[in-house]
Amino acid sequence: MQKKIVVHMYLKNGKAVTGFDGKELLEDGDVMSIAQHYSNNGADELLIFDLSDDDADHEQSLNLIRQISRVIDIPMSGGGHIKNLEDVKKLLYAGCQQVFLNYAKAANIELTEEVSKRFGKEKIAICTDSFAQLQANKARVNEYTSRVILLCDEVDVRTTARLVEVPVLPVSTRAD
């Protein structure tokens, strides 16, 4: 198996921030320069976590994702603020090669089959930090998604990877 360097960025209020709390800017918060830096310095993929609180912020994030897709030379996957099939479509049309559904939200779990059938299994991933959640939805994940993005700070990666048939990408969310 070939190893890849997969980097991630959190978007909040049009800026790159350091984590899910969205309280601190990453460097100066300039999304475009950070994305270009990742692309130009060895990253193989960029994950974008949209931390929008409302639809207006989400539209701003979608515009940034469109701009990022024009200036980077690596695949990009995106997720966050997904409520329905249309939100998945917007991320794909903005330039994401894959969209990940937040499995902490029950509505996203229910959405999995519909978006997979509409856009193809290869375009859909899930994001979780819960072994129990993944175990409860194992059949759905295996049938309708092509990857698990595992927020692994509190989860055993090896045990989780053995649970599902699709690849598991561990992502540490620690800033230290």
Which residues fall in each region the model found?
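Conserved phosphate/oxyanion-binding catalytic-loop motifs
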Residues: 78
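Alpha/beta catalytic cores of group-transfer enzymes, especially the acyltransferase/condensing modules
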Residues: 105, 113, 117-122
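Conserved N-terminal beta1-alpha1 strand-loop-helix module at the mouth
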Residues: 1-74, 82-90, 118-126, 130-149, ...
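Glycine-rich phosphate-binding active-site loops on the catalytic face of alpha/beta enzymes
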Residues: 53, 90-111, 149-156, 171-176
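Active-site phosphate/pyrophosphate- and oxyanion-stabilizing loops and adjacent acidic/basic residues
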Residues: 66, 113, 158
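Short amphipathic alpha-helical segments
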Residues: 60, 112-113
